[in-house]
Amino acid sequence: MRLTDIEIEQALDNGTIVIEPRPSIDAISGVSVDVRLGGQFRVFKDHTAPFIDLSGPSGEMQAALDRVMSEIIEIPDGEAFFLHPGELALAVTYESVTLPADIVGWLDGRSSLARLGLMVHVTAHRIDPGWQGKIVLEFYNSGKLPLALRPRMTIGALNFERLSGPVARPYNTRKNAKYKDQQEAVASRISQD
């Protein structure tokens, strides 16, 4: 079952769920807690490779990914990152999140932002049991105008579901967990599949 605001507050109080920095009481609503945008972004330099072969040899795939991903772009507080129509960018939450082995999280974008064409998490919105780290956001501007994104703006909401029991393989204990303990806008590691 989804956790209510009261249950989320209790989980934060007793350390079952850890969100750092801890959200204000105003950031917790009915079944979710707001998360904010961090200051790190990465973009695709699409002119550097004609394509990425997602089923090709892992070495070639990684080389193509390395050619097309920018280094981390740091945006200071008060300044803006501009996401243009049709562009995809990676970013990271301001908050770091730690979940136990019996709770799964879900990240939803804000309706107000979606109405402007901003997709906050293109497909991967599940936060696995045992997750620890910041959450990478996959932004896509499907609108007609550039969008200014500023560090610490509210960008989405996390909600949580308690499972019937702890999972046998929490994310933070899996040897093949590609994004374990991520603290920055990590690019795709599909070549490690």
Curated annotation (Swiss-Prot):
Its EC number is 3.5.4.13. It comes from the Bacteria. The active site is at 138 (proton donor/acceptor). Gene3D superfamilies: 2.70.40.10. It is an enzyme of class 3 (hydrolase). The keyword Transmembrane helix does not apply. DCTP binds at residues 110-115, 128, 136-138, 171, 178, 182. GO terms for biological process: dUMP biosynthetic process; dUTP biosynthetic process; nucleobase-containing small molecule interconversion. PANTHER family: DCTP DEAMINASE (PTHR42680:SF3). Catalyzes the deamination of dCTP to dUTP. This is dCTP deaminase. The lineage of its organism: Bacteria, Pseudomonadati, Pseudomonadota, Gammaproteobacteria, Alteromonadales.
